[in-house]
Amino acid sequence: MLHCAGPHTGKLVKQVAACCLLLPRFLLTGLMLWLLDFQCIRRRVLLTAREESTAEHEDPPLCVSDSNRMCTVESLRAVWHGQKLDYFKSAHLGCSAPNTEVVMLEGRRLCKILDFSQGKRPLVVNFGSCTUPPFMARLQAYRRLAAQHVGIADFLLVYIEEAHPSDGWLSTDASYQIPQHQCLQDRLAAAQLMLQGAPGCRVVVDTMDNSSNAAYGAYFERLYIVLEGKVVYQGGRGPEGYKISELRMWLEQYQQGLMGTKGSGQVVIQV
């Protein structure tokens, strides 16, 4: 009996420790969301972000309509969920990339993320959903970048749980109003909408147990690059840390490294 209790006790201790570590950041985020519900503060923050933007064509500044409430029970629940996923993720820079299961749109065939990695080519993994305004605002920039670097890298879009479901933390700025996925068919249907906005891109969906989202701490959206089974680029959590410009910079430096060394290609860049 004591032997059985050991793993459960360890798990409980880890959960409690995580809550203690995450609570200050969560409370700070909650305070920021509450302040952003004051229109004068929100407009000032968004204006400052727009003025400081240096790669607007790739990473357009965050846009939040006045009608959107920022501090609600649903928003706080979503923030806590995202912060917990980030804390418990198994993907880390320089470590082995989790080879989680995903579902292909064609034939609903189950496969694994690293199945899309070809030899020594980098695999760019882009996690997101149609109800995430920053993700959708950058989708065309991602598509252009993929087309420009298709000769040196592979690209994969992974559709995860909705960032702003219509029955949760609703965003009127979202391109689509989609409720939380109740079954795999719901997720596949939502992914088809993403594919329409990014024709030519390879799109798969996370399983309904959200294994890829959990392993990569991908919620709300996130970028990764995997090279020979290792995580060589880990983007920040969206929306603030989700930057196509960083992805472009990594790929350009990697390409320059290939041209300079004629082959080794082991480029690990942390940005």
Curated annotation (Swiss-Prot):
The record, for InterPro entries, names:
Iodothyronine_deiodinase, Iodothyronine_deiodinase_AS, Iodothyronine_deiodinase_I/III, Thioredoxin-like_sf
Q: Which UniProt keywords apply?
A: Cell membrane, Endosome, Membrane, Oxidoreductase, Selenocysteine, Signal-anchor, Thyroid hormones biosynthesis, Transmembrane, Transmembrane helix
Record's catalysed reaction(s): 3,3',5'-triiodo-L-thyronine + iodide + A + H(+) = L-thyroxine + AH2; 3,3'-diiodo-L-thyronine + iodide + A + H(+) = 3,3',5-triiodo-L-thyronine + AH2; 3-iodo-L-thyronine + iodide + A + H(+) = 3,5-diiodo-L-thyronine + AH2; L-thyronine + iodide + A + H(+) = 3-iodo-L-thyronine + AH2
The EC number(s) this enzyme carries: 1.21.99.3
Membrane association type: Single-pass type II membrane protein
Q: Where, in residue ranges, is this chain on the Extracellular side? A: 37-271
Q: What is the effect of changing residue 132 to L?
A: Loss of enzyme activity
Q: Name one GO biological process term.
A: thyroid hormone catabolic process
What domain of life is recorded for the organism? Eukaryota
**Cellular location of this protein?**
Cell membrane; Endosome membrane
Cite the ranges annotated as topological domain Cytoplasmic: 1-15
Q: Where are the transmembrane segments?
A: 16-36
Active-site residues, Swiss-Prot/TrEMBL:
132
What GO molecular function terms would the record report?
Answer: thyroxine 5'-deiodinase activity; thyroxine 5-deiodinase activity
Q: Which GO terms describe its cellular component?
A: endosome membrane; plasma membrane
| Keyword presence, Cell wall biogenesis/degradation | no
The similarity comment for this entry is:
Belongs to the iodothyronine deiodinase family.
According to its UniProt entry, the function of this protein is described as: Plays a crucial role in the metabolism of thyroid hormones (TH) and has specific roles in TH activation and inactivation by deiodination. Catalyzes the deiodination of L-thyroxine (T4) to 3,3',5'-triiodothyronine (rT3), 3,5-diiodothyronine (3,5-T2) to 3-monoiodothyronine (3-T1), rT3 to 3',5'-diiodothyronine (3',5'-T2) and 3,3'-diiodothyronine (3,3'-T2) to 3'-monoiodothyronine (3'-T1) via inner-ring deiodination (IRD). Catalyzes the deiodination of 3,5,3'-triiodothyronine (T3) to 3,3'-diiodothyronine (3,3'-T2) via IRD.
Per UniProt, subunit arrangement is: Monomer. Homodimer. May undergo minor heretodimerization with DIO1 and DIO2.
The name this protein goes by in its record:
Thyroxine 5-deiodinase
Which organism is the protein's source? Xenopus laevis (African clawed frog)
Lineage of the organism: Eukaryota, Metazoa, Chordata, Craniata, Vertebrata
> What gene is it encoded by?
dio3
